[in-house]
Amino acid sequence: MLEEYTRPARYVENSHIVTKPALSDAELIDFENVGTLESFNTDGLRSILFTMAHIPNMKEKTLRYPGHIDLMKGLIKAGFLNTTPISFKGQEISPMEFTSSLLFDQWKLGEREEEFTLMQIRISDAEKTICYDLYDEYDTVTQTSSMSRTTGYTCTAAVNMLIQKLFTAKGVFPPELIGKDETCFHFMLNYLKERNIHYRKTEKPVHP
């Protein structure tokens, strides 16, 4: 988890891979249901850098509450996220592992603690911008966190897709290649919708 704050962030600009420090290019963005969040570069494109190389511009950013960037920069500057071991009372310890151990319990959700998951996907060309917005909350009925719902049900959707032989290609495939198949794409969204996880799609002209 902490590595996303230290690993250089790669994105695509004018069909070239560009690398910048994590936490760079900060923006404040307003979201319905949540309010203002700050976004920053993280190395989240991963396989998409290569599987979607025909797309000239791609960027992934992480969203957190305002103030998060300065907090993490403070930890980095103080050395808490260094991976090089240091000597402490005769023992070699990794600052990164030490910090992770300290924060692990702080990150744990309390029993029935409510949280939410937010994601926005924006796709633009010369004519229009298409947005897919996801907002999901803790399910009080099933007592399931939104992160468990949005990730877990996506995995079980993929398993059901294979069982129903909707995706029959052989080999190892990242999710974006499965999504290129329109049938699989709609199966995934409908599966999530049945479990009250909704991606809201909107379209706007680039030049109204």
PLM feature spans:
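C-terminal catalytic/substrate-binding lobe primarily of soluble NAD(P)-dependent oxidoreductases
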Residues: 1-208
